[in-house]
Swiss-Prot record:
<keyword id="KW-0479">Metal-binding</keyword>
<feature type="zinc finger region" description="B box-type 2; atypical">
    <location>
        <begin position="56"/>
        <end position="96"/>
    </location>
</feature>
<feature type="binding site">
    <location>
        <position position="79"/>
    </location>
    <ligand>
        <name>Zn(2+) 2</name>
    </ligand>
</feature>
<feature type="binding site">
    <location>
        <position position="28"/>
    </location>
    <ligand>
        <name>Zn(2+) 1</name>
    </ligand>
</feature>
<keyword id="KW-0863">Zinc-finger</keyword>
<comment type="function">
    <text>Acts as a negative regulator of seedling photomorphogenesis.</text>
</comment>
<feature type="zinc finger region" description="B box-type 1; atypical">
    <location>
        <begin position="5"/>
        <end position="47"/>
    </location>
</feature>
<keyword id="KW-0804">Transcription</keyword>
<feature type="binding site">
    <location>
        <position position="84"/>
    </location>
    <ligand>
        <name>Zn(2+) 2</name>
    </ligand>
</feature>
<dbReference type="InterPro" id="IPR051979">
    <property type="entry name" value="B-box_zinc_finger"/>
</dbReference>
<dbReference type="InterPro" id="IPR000315">
    <property type="entry name" value="Znf_B-box"/>
</dbReference>
<feature type="compositionally biased region" description="Polar residues">
    <location>
        <begin position="114"/>
        <end position="128"/>
    </location>
</feature>
<feature type="binding site">
    <location>
        <position position="33"/>
    </location>
    <ligand>
        <name>Zn(2+) 1</name>
    </ligand>
</feature>
<feature type="binding site">
    <location>
        <position position="59"/>
    </location>
    <ligand>
        <name>Zn(2+) 2</name>
    </ligand>
</feature>
<dbReference type="InterPro" id="IPR049808">
    <property type="entry name" value="CONSTANS-like_Bbox1"/>
</dbReference>
<keyword id="KW-0678">Repressor</keyword>
<dbReference type="GO" id="GO:0005634">
    <property type="term" value="C:nucleus"/>
</dbReference>
Amino acid sequence: MRILCDACENAAAIIFCAADEAALCRPCDEKVHMCNKLASRHVRVGLAEPSNAPCCDICENAPAFFYCEIDGSSLCLQCDMVVHVGGKRTHGRFLLLRQRIEFPGDKPKENNTRDNLQNQRVSTNGNGEANGKIDDEMIDLNANPQRVHEPSSNNNGIDVNNENNHEPAGLVPVGPFKRESEK
């Protein structure tokens, strides 16, 4: 099962843009991401051929169709109905689409011209240079894109993060959120 392009809804998607949360075909990707400098910096990864169906974590026989985020398990239809009864119906469950993502560094099973062109057009380093070298680099989808040849920001050298005694903006606290009591 292929994912359709979120923009045109006609062609099969070959790219996933993390910033836009959109799966796009090649023509729509070029329209959306090559139209301006800011959009061209979005981290995009190629969508691979759909993988085989994972097996259910409970019965280990039937193909899994659901993923329960509370239980952290993949479930077939039958096991999902058995496990999620009563109060467990409130568990957030998601449909498994069996869509693999191609990350830089993944070794393709067969090396054809179409895949090489796709890898050369999609930037893996965030600065717009698409040189086709994906074997030595890994990308961090959580990292901010590198800014090249741009004027400095308008904060005039003030360290915004240290001025208000907050953690750096890229760090996310681990554990439950605790609200400090107001004085």
